[in-house]
């Protein structure tokens, strides 16, 4: 059985599940999962775990993300992105860059979002997009997310009653960048939507080192498994602690050990090898997942 982390470059037009399905065929391996859903139209980094590495996928999913995209101000859509139907138009003839930058900065920090109707969030066992497709509107729970950075990365282009510019956002798990784009428009007094998006970093993996499905397929055919990263890549967002060989033995038996840390979860290493995910219990740490077996 092969095992490891893959830094997949997801292409437009496929769901995250589609990507996993195709990788199962390419690798002839059933035990594969992804660390953070991307909408079909969104491209970029999709962390993939294979084999034993699927045991750390939840920690990859929890990690922060970085996106680059484009916001169009002047009209909004049903889906909050370019795939939806236009629902409101507010023509714009001028927009000051400093005003936009100030508005974007106001979203940095802890903010509250309401998931869009066209999303996979479940309400009463049913996904929101299923309600939306049936023409139903349901009450959606608010969620707290953290925006570390939200900045404009290009000049503002004014054309045909719209304003467009590119942006970069660094955010926590669960952030809807579509909704952030719409809320920015509201703050500026205009209808808006997210017109393009790609994920450039997730769980420590970056776009410049990601590989497409076709590249991975070619490597597999050539007998090259260098696309598989060690399982350690899946825990790099957790605080790392070094343990002794005696501690390593205790961990292998599932026993508590003392660790000089106040973090609720840590990744225990012996040298450069991750042994376990350890969970704080009072003054000691208990193995939550032993990975070295």
UniProtKB/Swiss-Prot annotation:
Instruction: Enumerate the InterPro entries for this protein.
Output: PsdUridine_synth_cat_dom_sf, PsdUridine_synth_N, tRNA_psdUridine_synth_TruB, TruB_C
Q: What class does this enzyme belong to in the EC scheme?
A: isomerase
The record's Pfam families line, in alphabetical order, gives:
TruB_C_2, TruB_N
List the Gene Ontology MF annotations in alphabetical order.
Answer: RNA binding; tRNA pseudouridine(55) synthase activity
Organism superkingdom: Bacteria
* Reactions mediated catalytically: uridine(55) in tRNA = pseudouridine(55) in tRNA
Question: Some GO term, biological process aspect, for this entry: which one?
Answer: tRNA pseudouridine synthesis
Q: Does the keyword tRNA processing apply?
A: yes
UniProt keyword annotations, A-Z = Isomerase, tRNA processing
Which Gene3D superfamilies has this protein been placed in?
A: Pseudouridine synthase
Record: active site:
39 (nucleophile)
Enzyme Commission number, as recorded: 5.4.99.25
Family statement drawn from the similarity comment of this UniProt entry: Belongs to the pseudouridine synthase TruB family. Type 1 subfamily.
Instruction: State the HAMAP family in the record.
Output: TruB_bact (MF_01080)
The record describes the protein's role as:
Responsible for synthesis of pseudouridine from uracil-55 in the psi GC loop of transfer RNAs.
Q: Kindly provide the name given to this protein in its UniProt entry.
A: tRNA pseudouridine synthase B
The taxonomy runs: Bacteria, Bacillati, Bacillota, Bacilli, Lactobacillales
**Name of the gene:** truB
């Amino acid at each position: 059985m092969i095992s490891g982390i893959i830094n997949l470059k997801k292409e437009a037009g496929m769901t995250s599940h589609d990507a996993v399905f195709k990788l199962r065929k390419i690798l002839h391996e059933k035990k594969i999962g992804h660390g953070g859903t991307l909408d079909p139209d969104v491209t970029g980094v999709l962390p993939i775990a294979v084999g034993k590495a699927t045991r750390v996928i939840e920690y990859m999913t929890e990690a922060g993300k970085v996106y680059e995209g484009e916001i169009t101000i002047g009209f909004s859509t049903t889906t909050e992105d370019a795939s939806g139907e236009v629902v409101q138009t507010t023509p714009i003839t001028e927009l000051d860059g400093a005003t936009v930058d100030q508005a974007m900065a106001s979203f940095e920090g802890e903010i509250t979002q309401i998931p869009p109707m066209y999303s996979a969030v479940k309400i009463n066992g049913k996904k929101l997009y299923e309600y939306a497709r049936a023409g139903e509107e349901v009450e959606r729970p608010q969620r707290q997310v953290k925006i570390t950075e939200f900045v404009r990365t290009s000049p503002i282009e004014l054309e045909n009653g719209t304003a467009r510019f590119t942006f970069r956002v660094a955010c926590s798990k669960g952030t809807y960048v579509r909704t952030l784009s719409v809320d920015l428009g509201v703050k500026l007094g205009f209808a808006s939507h997210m017109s393009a998006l790609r994920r450039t970093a997730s769980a420590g993996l970056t776009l410049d080192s990601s590989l497409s499905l076709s590249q991975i397929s070619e490597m597999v055919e050539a007998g090259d498994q260098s696309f598989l990263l060690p399982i350690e890549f899946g825990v790099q967002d957790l605080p790392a602690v070094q343990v002794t060989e005696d501690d390593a033995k205790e961990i292998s038996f599932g026993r508590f050990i003392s660790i000089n840390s106040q973090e609720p979860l840590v990744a225990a290493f012996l040298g450069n090898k991750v042994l376990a995910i350890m969970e704080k219990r009072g003054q000691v740490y208990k193995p939550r997942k032993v990975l070295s077996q």
